């Protein structure tokens, strides 16, 4: 009886694994290799216009899925992994905001020409808008006017929005019993 149950479970597992697409596997069932980074743009070499990249991933030996080759390797598309149209330097923007922000040069550099002129003729909004812009730019809440991201070093200080989906694991930690 025990062998029959074991055989049935193995048959059902192997039959169901073969119909699963490799892109639909759980993150703990495959390992993706590091991708090449372009030294000029500080982005992935495979960065596409929709901000996704292609990475090569290898499944565990016992995983069967549709889309992998005989070596167990498949290409996976990772969404929102790069910034394709980034052309405004984050470092330059911060330095312009600190040293020339009261003249509105930072806003003009980002593409906000009208606000830059207002800051220029009001000396940074009597230095209030200047301080606000330093904070907004350093926290990356104020970006380029065309909607692209900042061009910054690959391991630079990137701030990104946290998005939750069906693959996100999060826990709540409390201090019950800490004392």
Swiss-Prot record:
Glycosylation-annotated residues: 75, 169
Keyword Ligase: no
Limits of the TM2 domain: 88-135
Membrane topology, Extracellular segments: 19-82, 133-179
Regions of this protein lying in the Cytoplasmic compartment: 106-109
Protein location: Membrane
Keywords, sorted A to Z: Glycoprotein, Membrane, Signal, Transmembrane, Transmembrane helix
Main localisation: membrane
Signal sequence, renumbered to the chain: 1-18
Cellular component GO terms, alphabetical: membrane
Membrane-spanning residues: 83-105, 110-132
UniProt-listed InterPro entries: TM2, TM2D1-3-like
Membrane topology, from the record: Multi-pass membrane protein
PANTHER family: BETA-AMYLOID BINDING PROTEIN-RELATED, TM2 DOMAIN-CONTAINING PROTEIN 1
Protein family per UniProt: Belongs to the TM2 family.
Descriptive protein name: TM2 domain-containing protein Y66D12A.21
